[in-house]
Structures are given as structure tokens and as C-alpha cells.
Amino acid sequence: MSTTSSSGIERTLRGCRPADVDPVVIDAADLDSTAPDHLRDLKQGLAARGYQPAAVATEAAFDAEGTLERQREADRLRGLVRAASFLGAGRIEVAVEDEPSEEARTALAALAERADREGVEFVRVDGAA
């Protein structure tokens, strides 16, 4: 749950001005790494070219039967939430094919909570991205 009041957001917005940057959505498959050094270089390179990451987009693959595979996928998605936050992206878009299992829904709910703690909006997109 956000601790920033609506009036605080409005007050901040009143002082905003346009920036000469283009928002971009980064496809997670295009990230070579989510290591901080790589993300720092990527963020600097994008800024130098006039781009600001607005979102990181990915597909969730929870179709595996085994607990270990589901845990690996949850770990990968958590890493992408951290990457989105590090890059300054305001949201992570997660495409989910079909109706996820109960375990996948639990993992997605935990991911949404993590995103909230990291200051990133979690957006679930139904179907393949």
C-alpha cells in the first residue's frame, strides 16, 4: 500500500515540467543481464540517447509441473521487478497465457506485492505479449 498521499502527488505534479525524453518499454528478453552493473550501463546509454524506461515487459511461464521450475520462474520475475525499479521504470507488464494454476496465482500475487514495495506498478496482461 502506498504511503504517498494524493495531495503529495498533486503538489509534486504542479511543479513538474515536460522533459525531452521518449518513454520506452523494454522487453525483458532483450536484457542481456539484470546485474546492477549492466543495468547501470543500460540506463546511462538510454539516457544519453534521450530514452527513459517506462516499463519492462515479459511473459510468465508457469506451465511447468515441478515446484523447482515454478520457483525458478518466480525468481526470474522478481529479478525483473528489481531491474524495472533500478532502471526507473514505473511498471512491469507480465503476460500470462491461459488461466494460471493456484500456485501461479499465488506467485503472481507475491510478485505484485514485491513490485509495490519496489515502487513499480504490476500490470498483468492476459495472453501472449
Region locations from a protein language model:
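Active-site acidic/histidine proton-transfer and metal-coordination neighborhood
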Residues: E65-A129
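N-terminal pre-domain/capping segments
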Residues: M1-Q71, D75, D116
